[in-house]
């Protein structure tokens, strides 16, 4: 009896702990894909087929992180068995990855034809069909390193209930792998197509610290296509440890026909490679050589030249804003050396730079309407149009959005309507209108034979025929259906490495914001792909701050083409796990904060303000 009593007590304690952990995590349930045990038996017709396609799917979402288990970040035994069987059976076999994040493909790395389809919204099926049929040529590149699970050194520094220690410092993603010499399965910036390209140097020039690189990109294959030119800089190794290389510029070519070539010019400022000195609270370029590498992935570059900096240069004076964590950042032991003989050199001194001094001002200007509000009215203003019933939506044409500023303060005549959505606007698909206002409804409760189509202001709307004798939903004078476009996830947009495509996606959102009377889109997400298990990595662009900032700016510019339509760059900042996100404490050095986690926000704001 004592043993049984102790067992039951432990079970009850575990039950309570699970409830506590779920509550603290504050998330939604994320399930791994189940493993089905079966034998893959092909019919005679299938045996004689020319090609086989296997689609691997994964999901994730807000509130909970992914897990290091089979069916999530790992392949199941059945998936491995089936993929390898089909790969050996069919000469033409394609593994399609319909995923929003990294999956460890080590067990199937022998498969030579893998398509990262990602999650592309309404066009997903069309794109897959066009690629299979050869009507379109994929040209994307990875914005996150895909590696074997054992090669991720800092796996344990993730998912803690309270404190999360960013001990990797600035060595995030490819900055870590390249610096320690670990070869991932698929490096940052990597991506194949139905053709191949050669990138050669035309010229390397400068105007003070702005470096200009002209390249020639030639299509050497038998199919038209596009290439992504990527420029990396390996910084001086003087004084302080630094990543082996960092992306400083990228550009997508236009479509290049076979045997044709194009010239492109990319530029960057050397000041953007400066490291942050925590002791002196400034950005500094250490004297030494800065090597310029150009290629089509972080793992495939050529040295095009180098910059010789004759002295230390302070590029920006700031002040520290972060408290020191109780740990030391990771430092690699590798020292990098390149043979720079017969390589073009550009010589710079501190006279080629201007020191940026930041003036801090805490003056806050408010509208006159705000100045006259009392504390109660200010409180209402802060919490927005809060109603303690989830069935109620925001007022206006588009009910059921993420929120609305308050209508309960008489002095505030105008309100802002906001819509969530990581891949386009999230709106209620159906809502009802009666004498009380607007109400969110569930489509499953509506009987379609009670509705008719009406044309209002040139738009077709599905409305409920009103009758006082009707029961159930008879109170609603009108039922309105509305749908927004499902766009590619942020990671997929970034993998295009095409800022014009980013602007186009933003344009779609901005246009629909105008239709639905939405003022602010609660996107794009700016957080870094610090860890492959973050449940919302699909909402974010990349492990690299330059890609994140550039693509966020592109989306923002697309939205802001429309008057009074805007975005909210989120989540500011260091929100890199979902578990216990409302209570967790992200601890990092000032250097990591500024060089990695704030950099994307800075780029987006500066380029899209």
Describe each model-derived feature in a short phrase.
Residues 1-275, 284-300, 315-609:
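Glycoside hydrolase catalytic-domain context in secreted enzymes
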Residues 306-316:
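Short beta-strand edge segments in extracellular beta-sheet folds
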Residues 281:
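Extracellular/periplasmic metallocenter environments
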């Amino acid at each position: 009896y004592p043993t049984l009593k102790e067992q039951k007590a432990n079970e009850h304690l575990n039950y309570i702990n699970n409830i506590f952990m779920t509550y603290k995590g504050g998330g939604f349930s994320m399930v791994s894909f189940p493993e089905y045990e079966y034998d893959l038996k092909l019919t005679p017709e299938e045996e004689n087929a020319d090609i086989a396609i296997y689609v691997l799917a994964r999901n994730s979402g807000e509130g909970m992180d992914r897990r290091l288990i089979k069916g999530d970040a790992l392949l199941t035994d059945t998936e491995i068995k089936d993929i390898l069987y089909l790969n050996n059976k069919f000469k033409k076999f394609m593994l399609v990855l319909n995923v929003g994040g990294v999956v460890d493909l080590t067990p199937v790395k022998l498969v030579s034809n893998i398509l990262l389809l990602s999650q592309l919204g309404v066009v997903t099926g069309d794109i897959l069909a066009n690629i299979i049929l050869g009507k379109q040529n994929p040209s994307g590149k990875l914005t996150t390193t895909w590696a074997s699970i054992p090669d991720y050194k800092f796996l344990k520094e993730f998912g803690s209930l309270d404190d999360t220690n960013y001990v990797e410092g600035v060595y995030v993603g490819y900055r870590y792998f390249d610096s320690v010499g670990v070869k991932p399965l698929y490096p940052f910036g990597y991506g194949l197509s139905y053709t191949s390209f050669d990138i050669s140097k035309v010229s390397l020039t400068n105007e003070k610290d702005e470096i200009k690189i002209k390249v020639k990109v030639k299509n050497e294959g038998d199919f038209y296509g596009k290439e992504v030119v990527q420029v990396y800089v390996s910084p001086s190794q003087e004084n302080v440890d630094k990543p082996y290389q960092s992306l400083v510029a990228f550009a997508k070519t236009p479509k290049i026909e076979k045997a044709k070539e194009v010239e492109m010019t990319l530029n960057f400022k050397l000041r953007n490679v400066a490291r942050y000195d925590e002791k002196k609270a400034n950005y500094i370029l250490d004297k030494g050589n800065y090597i310029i590498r150009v290629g089509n992935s972080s793992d495939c570059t050529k040295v095009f030249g180098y910059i010789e900096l004759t002295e230390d240069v302070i590029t920006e004076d700031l002040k520290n804003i972060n408290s020191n964590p109780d740990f030391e950042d990771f430092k690699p032991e590798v020292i990098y050396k390149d043979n720079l003989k017969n390589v073009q050199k550009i010589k710079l001194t501190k006279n080629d730079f201007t020191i940026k001094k930041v003036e801090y001002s805490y003056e806050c200007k408010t509208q006159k309407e705000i100045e006259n509000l009392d504390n109660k009215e200010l409180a209402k203003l802060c919490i927005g149009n809060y109603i303690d019933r989830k069935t109620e939506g925001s007022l206006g044409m588009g009910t059921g959005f993420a929120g609305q500023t308050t209508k309960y303060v008489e002095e505030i005549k105008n309100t802002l309507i906001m819509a969530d959505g990581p891949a386009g606007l999230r709106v209620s698909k159906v809502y009802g209108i009666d004498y009380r206002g607007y109400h969110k409804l569930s489509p499953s409760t509506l009987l379609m034979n009670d509705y008719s189509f009406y044309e209002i202001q040139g738009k077709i709307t599905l409305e409920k025929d009103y009758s006082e004798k009707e029961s159930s939903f008879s109170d609603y004078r009108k039922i309105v259906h509305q749908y927004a476009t499902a766009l590619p996830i942020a990671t997929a947009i970034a993998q295009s490495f095409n800022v014009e495509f980013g602007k186009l996606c933003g344009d779609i959102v901005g246009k629909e914001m105008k239709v639905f009377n939405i003022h602010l889109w609660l996107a794009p997400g700016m957080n870094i792909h610090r860890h492959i298990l973050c449940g919302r990595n699909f909402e974010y662009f990349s492990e690299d701050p330059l890609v994140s900032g550039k693509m966020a700016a592109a989306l923002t510019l697309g939205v802001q083409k429309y008057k009074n339509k805007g975005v909210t760059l989120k989540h500011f900042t260091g929100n890199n796990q979902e578990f216990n996100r409302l209570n967790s404490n992200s601890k990092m050095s000032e250097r990591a904060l500024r060089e990695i986690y704030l950099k994307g926000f800075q780029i987006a704001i500066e380029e899209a303000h």
